[in-house]
């Protein structure tokens, strides 16, 4: 019997692109950085989140849920935290180059309200990794890695600051795979600091309702909505409270340090800690739908064509219009990937001349 239950989120371009893994060389350990939110909270969040992020399995003290099939890509470990002198992203695990998302399984550990790992969460996560290592023929000592090991992101933060805890975790997984009995895992204490925090930061936020909108800038306009959060999900960092028109919003940051704005009404959100209030929202400048307003998540190299790949206006090679071409061997920035229609390989969503376009999945290779 499996340690985790399968409850897959719908295929979508943001959190479950429907692309097939190229293999499983490692299993990657993460933490949610979202105190008090359990596995099902995160399943519901990633069901309709409009951010390019996800993981395969979420684990809390009561259950483990697999939200993306283990033969599909999840967006969990290809972020850019550092670059070398040549401008190349730091990639610390050679076996997962150039893009860990296509070669690994991502597992997220949920946090208690105080920011700690419950001992039952740790123990259940061990059992999840036992099952994964057996399934994919992996050695837990060499093939379980932290998100930190791949990109230098501070994740899972408690086991970056105390790496011995991570070593102990892998040893316990190894022992369980060998049929040895192990003592109950001890809880991990909350971390005392976060690299993304500043002196102005003293709170965290959770939504009281499903489908609560958040914005790219201080605004109430539909065009500035970048996603929604469900009940129990929110942001680990509240920077300040700002006035937007006649009402207030919180300036918040997600676990990656990206800034957003969300209503400050206590009807819709709960905030822990004290948060300073700014007299007015920062000034913003309007943007057009140019390349600067489309976020790049990486690049692909054009492969598998005789001379050039066709760029389409929508992800359906049977009914789309051709808007251009990209030559064989050239590179192009992507904003994600989608399943689309009439192609089992899906489509790369590319940034072509400042606009979104689509290239058949088989004609692009991540770099």
Curated annotation (Swiss-Prot):
Family: Belongs to the N-acetylmuramoyl-L-alanine amidase 2 family.
GO cellular component: extracellular region
Keyword vocabulary terms for this entry: Cell wall biogenesis/degradation, Competence, Hydrolase, Secreted, Sporulation
Cysteine disulfide links: none
Catalytically driven reaction(s): Hydrolyzes the link between N-acetylmuramoyl residues and L-amino acid residues in certain cell-wall glycopeptides
Phylogenetic placement of the source organism: Bacteria, Bacillati, Bacillota, Bacilli, Bacillales
Enzyme class: hydrolase
Source organism of this protein record: Bacillus subtilis (strain 168)
Domain of life: Bacteria
Subcellular location: Secreted
UniProt protein name: N-acetylmuramoyl-L-alanine amidase BlyA
Gene this protein is translated from: blyA
SH3b domain boundaries: 202-271, 298-367
Function in brief: Autolysins are involved in some important biological processes such as cell separation, cell-wall turnover, competence for genetic transformation, formation of the flagella and sporulation. Involved in prophage SP-beta-mediated cell lysis.
């Amino acid at each position: 019997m499996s340690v985790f239950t399968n409850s897959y989120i719908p295929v979508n371009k943001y959190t479950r692109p429907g692309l097939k893994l190229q293999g499983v060389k490692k299993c990657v350990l993460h933490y949610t950085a979202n105190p008090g939110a359990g596995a099902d909270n995160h399943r519901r969040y990633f069901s309709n989140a409009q951010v390019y992020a996800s993981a395969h399995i979420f684990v809390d003290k009561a259950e483990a849920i697999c939200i993306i099939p283990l033969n599909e890509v999840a967006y969990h470990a290809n972020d850019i935290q550092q670059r070398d002198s040549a401008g190349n992203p730091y990639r610390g695990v050679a076996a997962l180059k150039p893009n860990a998302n296509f070669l690994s399984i991502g597992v997220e550990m949920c946090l208690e309200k105080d920011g700690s790992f419950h001992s039952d969460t740790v123990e259940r996560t061990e059992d999840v990794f036992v099952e994964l290592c057996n399934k994919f023929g992996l050695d837990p000592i060499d093939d379980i890695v932290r998100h930190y090991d791949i990109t230098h992101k501070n994740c899972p933060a408690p086991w970056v600051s105390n790496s011995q805890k991570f070593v102990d975790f892998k040893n316990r997984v190894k022992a369980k795979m060998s049929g040895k009995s192990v003592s109950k895992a001890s809880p991990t204490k909350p971390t005392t600091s976060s690299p993304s925090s500043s002196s102005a930061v003293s709170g965290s936020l959770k939504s009281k309702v499903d489908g609560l909108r958040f914005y790219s800038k201080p605004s109430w306009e539909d065009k500035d909505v970048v996603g929604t959060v469900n009940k129990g999900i929110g942001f680990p960092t509240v920077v300040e409270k700002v006035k937007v028109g006649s009402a207030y919003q919180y300036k918040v940051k997600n676990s990656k340090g990206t800034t957003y704005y969300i209503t400050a009404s206590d009807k819709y959100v709960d905030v822990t800690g004290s948060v300073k209030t700014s007299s007015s929202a920062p000034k913003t400048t309007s943007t057009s739908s140019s390349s600067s307003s489309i976020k790049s998540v990486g690049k692909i190299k054009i492969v598998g064509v005789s001379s050039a790949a066709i760029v389409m206006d929508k992800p359906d090679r049977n009914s789309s219009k051709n808007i251009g071409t990209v030559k064989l061997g050239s590179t192009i920035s992507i904003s994600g990937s989608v399943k689309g229609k009439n192609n089992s390989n899906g489509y790369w969503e590319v940034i072509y001349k400042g606009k979104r376009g689509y290239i058949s999945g088989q004609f692009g290779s991540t770099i």
